[in-house]
Amino acid sequence: MRTSVPGVVLATSLLVAAQPAAAEDGQVELVGETTLPHAMQFDGTTVGGLSGVDYDPSTGQWAVISDDRSERHPARYYTADFDGTRFELTGTRPLLRPDGTTYPAGSVDPEDIRWDPLAEGFWWTSEGDRGEQLIDPSIRGADTGGSSTHDLPLPANLRMTPTTGPKRNEALEGLTLAAGGTRVVTATEGPLLQDGESPTTEHGALSRITLQSRTGSVLAQYAYPLDPVFAASPTGGSANNGATAVLADQGDQYLVLERAFVSGVGNSIRIYRTDTRTATDVQHVESLTNADVQPARKQLVVDLADLAPSTIDNIEGMTWGPRLPDGRRSLVLISDDNFSPNQTTQILTLAVK
């Protein structure tokens, strides 16, 4: 049985032909499912748009970040308690600019959050924007009160220019801290402008996983092969697939959550284990289109549809939770309801062998 994506091939041919290895049966089990009420009010804020989640094993505290662009309330994060069945918010703090003020409406797009194991605080990403005004994505640090502590420099190819950099809504969706907190790892949701088309039903695409030091030095950057979109829209509406979360696993391995949405069909959520050890470092590769590079290998951990949850919503956040009583690791997922009454904030707990 094949255990990984084939080796060095032209990027364009990989996107059509390469297939990840199948998941091993029985390795993942759905053990918990809960939801939050739509437009729930907490401490003067409307809860929604929860696009990132993290768990601190040293304190037992959970963090979730809202992708509210300071349009309903100031950009913010929440703390929470979670026992696997009941998810209870315990606090909220605004995310602050270096001058101590809140972000103006539309100037920030929070996406992911990770507790810092080496300092009292957390890291978070903003997707930026490719609109009338170009706003670079960002990786920022904050203390537990939300005050800014640092801003990590980005490699040039992740910055916005008129012809290069992340596409709109396909920038830094995923963030994780690896190697004991010494390595800052991000994933773009989709390919950069210079890296070709986003996934379609005919082909996948190459996003980029970037490894940096805590001071911003680029340690490596790898091409990650996104799946094609799983179905065509029967209504002619939108159809997409992208990486919405990355999570440190073991050594040079990471879990990547691919979230696909097809208008008139629904969502598909697949989690892959990706291994960068044999991948080409592409930090100096200007464009991945037709580039002769070896992407990171990936193996399917679980297709959420196989676990038959009550629904599959717009899941964007992923974190390791506490060990379960039987010794298995818990993997917790959270959905971004886009503040829509037609969606739900869904929290799923998976048991992983």
Language-model segment annotations:
Residues 1-24:
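Secretory targeting and sorting signals
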Residues 20-353:
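Sequence/structural signature of beta-propeller domains
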